[in-house]
């Protein structure tokens, strides 16, 4: 297929147009005074959302070159969302500012590679500054504040804080839709492993791309299963008592996987195959954890057991198993309570005796998975669009709260980024053009506060100047502007806080993608094919 090419300034301008379209749509949602965006759906009611990444993902532009710029900015939001689940709008605002300021410098003759190098040095200084001023999250009130800000709803904040306190920071919390209009919460014992289904054909819920099996039998082995003959005896025995079977193995492929998928599609058996978590000796230990939790037996040739010798008594049980592409959760394993407690005590003893920090960390993860619980938050609303919007906010708030517990908090409302600017004075540059990269980030770090003020109907420049003046007068770096009340004050005391991980990820991802965009010199895209018009019908033909 023939290609069309753009070079130099023309290429960068096309990318900028795409970046601006996405950023202008996304940044209107920033902050508690941010607006909603309504997204048309081919079927059903439109989706109304306050979530930056949801807006960004929906944008597809007709011009292929502009669309490249748009997709790069979508990547900023998506990457930030994947890592921390929040801060996507902040990352988008930062990236747009870096791109716009950077393109001015490049057009004026600065070297884009040196600008990028300056940006990379500057972002390291900002991240170090953010970490140095982080305040650890110690109590439930702090978690409630963080979650409430993310969701713009104090009820959601209190709910998430309560659930996190109940299951512990190592527990698993999932968000589901409720049939009622109020929030509901359920607590269940369970274990989550970081391996999902081997094939998407095992999915039972296409909307959520999840495989859900109720009351399944569970085969646990450390062997790779390629031949169906290996598991045929246990399959036949299992089919006499249930259709639901979960297989946890080193791998399932070839004929065995094909047979399971075909029989699943035919409805003969509702199977789910999951790869075993971990590697080496740790994998065997984790498989043994699953076996004890579910009351099954680990089938391993190391202990003289082959797959074809497995019986129904060797299979574990659980009330429910849920698997997506990344994780699998075993809910209410039917294992013996005394055996589970003994296993927990055994792991605790290993934690106390180990001298390796890495081993201690992995043992603590296993302990959390065995001892931790699973909480289900059910979100209710009066209408379908409101339900989806509220569910998005709860998911974001949950991710934000977890991030706060991990790395601590900083003052919110763009204050942390504003007060990190002096750290850029200490950045050592080798070449003159690297200074431009530092200058670009200096300006970009003001942009989130500027946009927050703009969304609240205020002049961003005036707000930033006032905040700086008050910080200097009162010698308090936590002073900022509360866009909800229109007051200036200590953001920590007002409960306006952001997790360090969210703020840090937003800056790092914005600089990463914007740097790539600034150093782009050529764009290549397919020339769209013109579809021939339909032929006109011949004379005398009756239609």
From Swiss-Prot:
Enzyme Commission number(s) of this protein? 5.6.1.7
Q: Does the keyword Membrane apply?
A: no
> Which keywords label this protein?
ATP-binding, Chaperone, Cytoplasm, Isomerase, Nucleotide-binding
The family database entries (Pfam families) matched by this protein are listed as: Cpn60_TCP1 (PF00118)
Query: Can you cite an annotated GO cellular component?
Result: cytoplasm
Q: Where does ATP bind?
A: 29-32, 86-90, 413, 482-484, 498
Question: Where can this protein be found?
Answer: Cytoplasm
Which CDD domains does the UniProt entry name for this protein? GroEL
GO function term, MF aspect, one? ATP binding
Q: Which reaction does it catalyse?
A: ATP + H2O + a folded polypeptide = ADP + phosphate + an unfolded polypeptide
Please provide the Gene Ontology terms (biological process) for this protein.
protein refolding
Residue span of the signal peptide, if any?
Answer: none
UniProt lists the family membership as follows:
Belongs to the chaperonin (HSP60) family.
Assembly and oligomerization = Forms a cylinder of 14 subunits composed of two heptameric rings stacked back-to-back. Interacts with the co-chaperonin GroES.
Task of the protein: Together with its co-chaperonin GroES, plays an essential role in assisting protein folding. The GroEL-GroES system forms a nano-cage that allows encapsulation of the non-native substrate proteins and provides a physical environment optimized to promote and accelerate protein folding.
Q: What is this protein called?
A: Chaperonin GroEL 1
Q: Which organism is it from?
A: Roseiflexus castenholzii (strain DSM 13941 / HLO8)
């Amino acid at each position: 297929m023939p290609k069309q090419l753009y070079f130099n300034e023309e290429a960068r301008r096309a990318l900028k147009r795409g970046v601006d379209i996405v950023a202008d749509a996304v940044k209107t949602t920033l902050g508690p005074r941010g607006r909603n965006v309504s997204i048309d759906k081919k079927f059903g009611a439109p989706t109304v959302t306050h979530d930056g990444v949801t807006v960004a993902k929906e944008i597809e532009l007709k011009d292929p070159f502009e669309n490249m710029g748009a997709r790069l900015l979508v990547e900023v939001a998506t990457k930030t969302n994947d890592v921390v689940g929040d801060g996507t709008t902040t990352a988008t605002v930062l990236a747009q500012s870096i791109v716009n300021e950077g393109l001015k410098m490049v057009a004026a003759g600065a070297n884009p590679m040196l600008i990028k190098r300056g940006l990379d040095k500057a972002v390291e200084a900002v991240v170090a500054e953010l970490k140095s001023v982080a305040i650890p999250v110690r109590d439930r009130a702090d978690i409630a504040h963080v979650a409430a800000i993310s969701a713009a709803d104090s009820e959601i904040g209190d709910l998430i804080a309560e659930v996190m306190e109940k299951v512990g920071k190592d527990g698993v919390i999932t968000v589901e839709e409720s049939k009622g209009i109020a929030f509901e919460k359920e607590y269940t014992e369970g274990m989550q492993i970081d391996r999902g289904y081997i094939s998407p054909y095992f999915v039972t819920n296409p909307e959520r791309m999840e495989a859900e099996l109720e009351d399944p039998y569970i085969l646990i082995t450390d062997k790779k299963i390629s031949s169906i003959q290996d598991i045929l005896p246990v399959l036949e025995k299992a089919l006499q008592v249930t259709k639901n079977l979960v297989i946890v193995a080193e791998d399932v492929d070839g004929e065995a996987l094909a047979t399971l998928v075909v029989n699943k599609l035919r409805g003969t058996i509702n199977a789910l195959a999951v790869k075993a978590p971990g590697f080496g000796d740790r994998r065997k230990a984790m498989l043994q954890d699953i076996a004890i939790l579910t009351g099954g037996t680990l089938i391993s040739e190391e202990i003289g057991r082959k797959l074809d010798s497995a019986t129904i008594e060797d299979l574990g049980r659980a009330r429910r198993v849920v698997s997506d592409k990344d994780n699998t959760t075993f809910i209410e394993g039917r294992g013996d309570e005394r055996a589970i407690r003994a296993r927990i005590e055994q792991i605790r003893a290993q934690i106390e005796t180990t001298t390796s920090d890495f081993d201690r960390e992995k043992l603590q993860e296993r302990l959390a998975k065995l001892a931790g619980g699973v909480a289900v938050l059910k979100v209710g609303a009066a209408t379908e669009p409101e339900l989806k919007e509220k569910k998005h906010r709860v998911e974001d708030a949950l991710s934000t709260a977890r991030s706060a517990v991990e790395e601590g908090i900083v003052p919110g409302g763009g204050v942390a980024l504003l007060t990190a600017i002096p750290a850029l004075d200490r950045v050592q540059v080798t070449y003159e053009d690297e200074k431009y990269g530092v200058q670009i980030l200096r300006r970009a770090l003001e942009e989130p506060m500027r946009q927050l003020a703009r969304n609240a109907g205020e002049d961003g420049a005036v707000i930033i100047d006032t905040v700086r003046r008050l910080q200097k007068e009162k010698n308090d770096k936590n002073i900022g502007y509360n866009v909800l009340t229109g007051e200036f004050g200590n953001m920590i005391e007002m409960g306006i806080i952001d997790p360090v991980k969210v703020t840090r990820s937003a800056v790092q991802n914005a600089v990463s993608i914007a740097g790539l965009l600034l150093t782009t010199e050529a764009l290549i895209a397919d020339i769209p094919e013109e579809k021939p018009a339909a032929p006109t019908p011949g004379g005398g033909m009756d239609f």
